[in-house]
Amino acid sequence: QEPTVKGDHAPAELGITPATELTFAGEPLRMAALLIAERVSQGNKLEPLTLAEALTKFIAQTSSFYLLPNPLLTLARALTLAGGPWQLNFSYQAQCADLFKQLLEHPADPPSYQHIPGSGDVNLKLTSSSMGTSLGDSDRLVRAPYTDAIYSEWQTVVLVGTVPVLLDGAGAAAWMACPIPHTLAEIHADVVAALGEHRKSWNLVDETVDTLLAAGLLQVVE
């Protein structure tokens, strides 16, 4: 048997008609929902994804998306062109018709998002700091240099060079609080304003800041 060669071809090269040129019942076709499909060993299941989850899943399947201008913004725009996004886990694609029908009968609006532009530098590296345990009341923290970021549905995806980091909960709130230098008290106030009061909120913020410093996503202002 002759070996096969894998190649990349544009739809037009394969004779595939662009959807913008197709109609149904006299109306132009449009994309109704956006799915990220994954083959599994058993069963067919459709689940909603947050935009941040969809971004990280999509990024894992690419090798050079970070070379795009504003890479996360470019992907977020693509992933919100239609309802969803959704995760389709399938073992038999031919048995997914009912799931697709449900999407058409109950369309979902795409999520909103906020773009937080970074430096655009794809050569950045995550550099951890161990200063969290010795922070004083007057010490101030700010976001470490990053390439691009997207905030949506209480989650933030931060791209540092070629590495995406998904933050949620207090992590997302604390990172979002630091476009300019903030003390721990100011970060705590912003996290509580975003997520609500909690009897252990100070401990939670302290631990979160330590984690963000160790991950290289926040840095202490010298």
Model-found features: residue ranges?
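Acidic, low-complexity/disordered tracts enriched in E/D and polar residues
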Residues: 111-176, 206, 219-222
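Aromatic-enriched hydrophobic runs in primary sequence
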Residues: 22, 39, 54-55, 80, ...
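Generic signal for short, ordered secondary-structure residues
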Residues: 13, 58, 153-157, 166, ...
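A broadly tuned preference for mixed-charge, low-complexity surface segments
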Residues: 81-99, 148, 152-155, 199-219
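Glycine-rich, often acidic-flanked micro-motifs
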Residues: 1-139
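Long, charge-rich, low-complexity alpha-helical segments
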Residues: 163-222
